[in-house]
């Protein structure tokens, strides 16, 4: 499947020169629904590359959590590679943390409103929390502080968060 376009869920990977590589969108219409196992059939490795917004409301982060649960519970033999980037809102942690008994609609239970973690750190947290055994590889994306806020986003983390500066306001930064 080729994915083209320039909005969340509609991406153009032609610049990568990766003919013959399939790209699978993991975000579903219902972002809290389990991932369809059929999507993972005949997949050798999964590369996750997107910029987290720094907020627990990030729908792609929710999809990653559900993806990890699916791989773990279905015992799918799949290596997962996370391209880790800095958190656009920095390391500050604030806001409420709710339990699994609370409603899922506000994001992943156990994660603070502004979590202060990178995508790789979130992935490692999810992996450990569910007791996963599949191969997880976190690849650091080094960013110099001078260019940190000018990083291009290849995939917006949410339809309502089109850019890096939006994420700082979205999480309630003053």
Where are these regions (language model features)?
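A short helix->loop->beta-strand "cap" motif at the edges of active sites that frequently abuts
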Residues: 71-79
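Short, well-ordered, mixed-charge alpha-helical segments that flank or form enzyme active sites
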Residues: 32-33, 54-57, 87-93, 145-149
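N-terminal beta-loop-helix "entrance" segment that forms/cooperates
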Residues: 2-20
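Conserved anion/nucleotide-ligand pocket segment
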Residues: 103-174
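Glycine-rich oxoanion-binding loops at beta->alpha junctions
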Residues: 15-42, 55
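Glycine-rich, charge-decorated loop segments at or immediately adjacent to ligand/cofactor-binding or catalytic sites
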Residues: 5-8, 81-103
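Glycine/threonine-rich flexible loop motifs
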Residues: 52-64
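Short acidic catalytic loops
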Residues: 45-53, 81-84
